[in-house]
Swiss-Prot record:
GO cellular component terms listed in the entry, alphabetical order: cytosol; peroxisomal matrix; plasma membrane
Name of the protein in its database record: Catalase
EC numbers: 1.11.1.6
Keywords associated with the record: Cytoplasm, Heme, Hydrogen peroxide, Iron, Metal-binding, Oxidoreductase, Peroxidase, Peroxisome
CDD domains: catalase_clade_1
Cofactor(s) needed by this chain: heme
Reaction catalysis annotation: 2 H2O2 = O2 + 2 H2O
Assembly and binders: Homotetramer.
GO terms under biological process: hydrogen peroxide catabolic process; response to hydrogen peroxide
Cellular compartments annotated: Cytoplasm, Cytosol; Peroxisome matrix
Known role: Catalyzes the degradation of hydrogen peroxide (H(2)O(2)) generated by peroxisomal oxidases to water and oxygen, thereby protecting cells from the toxic effects of hydrogen peroxide.
């Protein structure tokens, strides 16, 4: 009998029903009782096992990005970037790397409509020969706050009222009135792009600045951009209401059906590159996650293409248990000093350990597809077969040794130990620049969304005045139009 053959897998299903331990089940309908009317006997092991398993079927949903859909495919390098990075998966045009991608909404629960106004998650896990690289981004290039100290409050303000469980504008506008840097993200959040028609027709962004390092050790800051080959398409508020009322899973269905029909979604990957010596040449901090980099100065460079050509086999195993972490990088890619990115490195792994368990990286969808070895051992639900006698390092009985050193950015950091804001906040300029690129009808939809939100009866005159001041500092005309429709006199 081959004891290694029958590992847990549907590939080894028997033609008849069994318990988890493999014992035969001859009746899956009737409980074991005393007589036909009962009571039920506790010795009905299969009944107890079936109910106990059902009670534990679900895991805690993600605190953000709970509603999502996943698909598999590949990333192919199309342009040579070896002068910028020594990353193996980017080593030459034509190199392909298997990936799994997850799209999501951010704020609402697992079963919420995919048609609601929200930022969308756009996360890609590259299964490279040097380990997993997780590019965990969104469909907008900026975020509401630049410091993770405010992140829990940011999410709570966006989520439903803890008393009524209703998402309310007064809570959102109250909290973010204390974060003027959030206006740039609102220029996306209240814009058409946060009502994408589906996942296939939206952009993706790495959001944060990272670093690319070449073989010589030269580092450049980098931002990642995903551009859909089928173009960007959004819905109006009215269309979103109609679509959500018809099918609350419309984007998941569209993604699944498109792949099943052979109409594979595709995105082009572009990067922006900045020399670290140029960081101080801008009127904003390039490592501030509330800012974008000007494309006229730092143009988009093509790198490769992402193609999703396989649907997942099991939603729970490959979507609910799929775990991303910005801390997962590979040689040739490194973090920047972005404050929010630095804290996400800890927070994502921490939430996965809580949500899935300490051995979540052993799950097939999360495990690297290359040889790997460490002495992280045991723990709840560990299922890795290990037969070593040495579980420590260094050892003269174990040939395992540290890996070859690869280049990482080296720089001298100086400063006082203090809690403070960055010197170049420049909170409003880019929000105004974005607004002025729109056609009048798009500007009007943006203004209407502000008027609707600020008309919430619990939004105070003080809060309205603050937001009109912010909008006016971004674009005087925009602030005046919102103020006039609210019958509020602008302060600027």
């Amino acid at each position: 009998m081959d004891l290694s053959k029958y590992r847990p897998s549907s590939a080894y299903d028997t033609p008849f029903l069994t318990t988890n331990a493999g014992g035969p089940v001859y009746n899956n309908v009737s409980s074991l009782t005393v007589g036909p009317r009962g009571p039920v006997l506790l010795e009905d092991y299969h009944l107890i096992e079936k109910l106990a398993t059902f009670d534990r079927e679900r895991i805690p949903e993600r605190v953000v990005h709970a509603r999502g859909a996943s698909a598999k495919g590949f990333f192919e390098v199309t342009h040579d970037v070896s002068h910028l990075t020594c990353a193996d998966f980017l080593r030459a045009p034509g190199v392909q790397t298997p990936v799994i991608c997850r799209f999501s909404t951010v704020v609402h629960e697992r079963g919420s409509p995919e048609s609601i106004r929200d930022i969308r998650g756009f996360a890609v896990k590259f299964y490279t020969r040097e380990g997993n690289f997780d590019l965990v981004g969104n469909n907008v290039p900026v975020f509401f706050n630049r410091d993770a100290k405010s992140f829990p409050d940011t999410i709570r303000a966006l989520k439903p009222n803890p008393k009524s469980h209703i998402q309310e504008n007064w809570r959102i506008l109250d909290f973010f009135s204390f974060l003027p840097e959030s206006l740039h993200t609102f220029a996306f959040f209240y814009d058409d792009v946060c009502l994408p028609i589906n996942y296939r027709h939206m952009e993706g962004f790495g959001v944060h600045a990272y670093q690319l390092i070449n073989k010589a050790g030269k580092a450049h800051y980098v931002k990642f951009h995903w551009k859909p080959t089928c173009g960007v398409k959004s819905m109006t508020e009215e269309e979103a209401i109609r679509v959500g009322g018809t099918n609350h899973s419309h984007a998941t269905k569209d993604l699944y059906d498109s792949i099943a029909a052979g109409n594979y979604p595709e995105w082009k990957l572009f990067i922006q590159i900045m020399d670290p010596e140029d960081v101080d040449k801008f009127d904003f901090d390039p490592l501030d996650v509330t800012k974008t980099w000007p494309e006229d100065i730092l143009p988009l460079m093509p790198v490769g293409r992402l193609v999703l050509n396989r649907n997942i086999d099991n939603f729970f195993a490959e979507n609910e248990q799929l775990a991303f972490n910005p801390g997962h990088i590979v040689p040739g890619v490194y973090y920047s000093e972005d404050k929010l990115l630095q804290t996400r490195i800890f927070a994502y792994a921490d939430t996965q350990r809580h949500r899935i368990g300490p051995n979540y990286m052993q799950l097939p969808v999360n495990a690297p597809k290359c040889a790997h070895h460490n002495n992280h051992r045991d723990g709840a639900m560990n299922f890795m077969h290990r037969d070593e006698e040495v579980d420590y390092l260094p050892s003269r009985f174990d040939p395992c040794r540290p890996a070859e050193q690869y280049p990482i950015p080296s720089c001298v950091l100086t400063g006082r130990r203090e809690k403070c804001v960055i010197p170049k906040e420049n909170n409003f300029k880019q929000a105004g620049e974005r607004y002025r690129t729109w056609e009048p009808d798009r500007q009007d939809r943006y203004i209407n969304k502000w008027v609707e939100s600020l008309s919430d009866p619990r939004v105070t005159h003080e809060i309205r005045s603050i937001w009109i001041s912010y909008l006016s500092q971004a674009d005087k005309s925009c602030g005046q139009k919102v103020a006039s429709r609210l019958l509020v006199k602008p302060t600027m």
